[in-house]
């Protein structure tokens, strides 16, 4: 009889040292505090609807929007590094039916993929969290896709607006319980 063992990934910790939990609200904040604020919804090109994940300016008095993490594995309550999960802003939007994060198509002018919001039950809405050099990165690399072109979330400044996008330098984040 074969015995298999699977190593348990360490839990992702919030700024209080507690494991992230399914359904609990958190702010996603930069681990480098002098470059920008918490994550929120932003619009591109002065569009009337904020349909993209972005970052508050460092000088803003807005605290951003809280998110919840929803592991794709039924019954999983603790968020471990590498857990496949959905990320959802806990805010109402009159512009979108869902505030769940998803990866958009590659932009031809930047070669980057922006993170937007909207209905997404497929792989475009599945993220994970990894730890690198003591900070956390938000990653997109759904296992069900046979390892597509994976990416780490970073910040791309477009017309003065800080937007979350893949395919550039990773941006370190931390999680603050709301």
Regions found by a protein language model. Give the residues of each.
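Extracellular glycan/ECM-engagement signal in secreted proteins
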Residues: 2-47, 82-89, 93-178
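Structured domain cores in non-transmembrane regions
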Residues: 46-98
């Amino acid at each position: 009889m074969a015995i298999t063992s699977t190593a348990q990934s360490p839990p992702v910790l919030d700024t209080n040292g507690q494991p992230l939990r399914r359904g609990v609200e958190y702010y996603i904040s930069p681990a480098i505090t002098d470059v920008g604020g918490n994550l929120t919804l932003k619009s591109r090109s002065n569009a009337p609807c904020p349909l993209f994940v972005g970052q508050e300016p460092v000088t803003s008095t807005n605290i951003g929007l809280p998110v919840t993490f929803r592991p794709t594995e039924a019954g999983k309550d603790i968020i471990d590094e590498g857990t496949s999960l959905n990320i959802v802003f806990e805010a109402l939007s009159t512009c979108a039916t869902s505030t769940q994060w998803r990866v958009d198509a590659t932009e031809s002018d930047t070669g980057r993929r922006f993170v937007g919001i909207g209905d997404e039950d497929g792989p475009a809405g599945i993220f994970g969290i990894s730890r690198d050099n003591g900070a956390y990165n938000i990653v997109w690399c759904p296992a069900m896709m046979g390892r597509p072109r994976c990416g780490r979330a970073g910040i791309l400044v477009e017309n003065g607006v800080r937007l979350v996008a893949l395919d550039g330098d990773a941006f370190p984040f931390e999680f603050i319980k709301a």
